[in-house]
């Protein structure tokens, strides 16, 4: 279960307003006449400093004693060029704050700037209404990177550190938030040599903050979808009308789209199960074949020894079975069980093929038509395999090394992301371990009860647009 974020604490300068280039440029210009060695780059360390520490640093930089006269000189330099703060307010700031407030999150501002400056900025930008808690660094003896300002703000909010998402940018600010025990999201700014290594999360825009809060501090970079009962309704294969637009919006928000299905890619293509949908990768056949950007990244084949045992088992029992190779599917026979099973998933009956030479074939998955009573004998003949039942007389059979969760791990490795950065959607028994493993597991409203118990969140059914509703719930679209 993702951690619950209850409050978001913002730094001001460099976060809500793009003030750092303005402040530093103005100060450098006003000081260079008297102190020509002062450059914009030499002033970078002042970003995030408190109003107490800043003049002392500048005295050292200007190679003069720190005196009231020098402090007055700095103040006069700052006053020489008035700043119109609404012009440097980040355009995404207000919509982001409105969304966070609508989500019921507590908001606070903790800035190293003097309180008078904070109130001026918030007042001129029309943001005062969003921050019932405002804390200034001038209230404390120690400034950032000391965590006191954030610990005090958390206490004012009545929240534990793990319930707080802190949005920072500067080296000192990130260090202060991390030392306070909060979850720190660092806003990247390539213009400044900030050390943001202590931050657990990194964002390119404030517009990412609502999703981080809704997802419990997880930055979702990949979404895995079961097909039947998740993207489309089971049996009828009906797709919700809003689904294509929802998935397109998800991709535009930087999330990779991947399938995680028990189906063979041929079924999806030939039956036109997902018209108009495009995916970046897939774990097919319950993770037996994994592809990323059209290239295989992992595969598990059933061994020749297991296939020989299966051959003997089928000859002995007369059961029907479907065989899934890389580029084809076929059955050994058609009987009432197979007809009923294919009708259950709304898929055509595959062509027939002899079992001669079965041991030499590259088989990824099997679909034996066996009852629960017959299943133990099959597994005894194939000890390196496991089954997942999806009907009264039918199972999926894969290697023990397979499984949707194994496929997701292989795909995450190929993408260079962690499991924690994933969200997965499913409804069936073969989805349970996948939902337990993903950063966020979402069960459809039509899911099996044991699958719902394994999920972090339960959405509505396929027919009720459950998938799109879940994406909205987690602010991913």
Please state what every model-predicted region is.
Residues 2-44, 219-223, 227-275:
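Active-site neighborhood of HAD-like aspartate-dependent phosphohydrolases
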Residues 197-222, 240, 380, 397-477:
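Mg2+-dependent phosphoryl-transfer enzymes with acidic/Ser/Thr/Gly-rich catalytic loops
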Residues 69, 241-337:
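Active-site phosphate-binding/coordination module
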Residues 37, 57-95, 103-105, 220-238, ...:
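Metal-dependent phosphoesterase signature
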Residues 159, 309, 313-434, 446:
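Conserved acidic, metal-coordinating active-site core of Asp-based
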Residues 86-87, 108, 114-165, 171-175, ...:
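Substrate-recognition "cap/lid" segment bordering the active-site pocket of phosphatases
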Residues 4, 82-109, 115-119, 236-255, ...:
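Short, acidic loop-to-helix structural element flanking the phosphoryl-transfer center
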Residues 27, 93-123, 177, 247-270, ...:
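Substrate-recognition element of Asp-dependent hydrolases with the DxDx(T/V) motif
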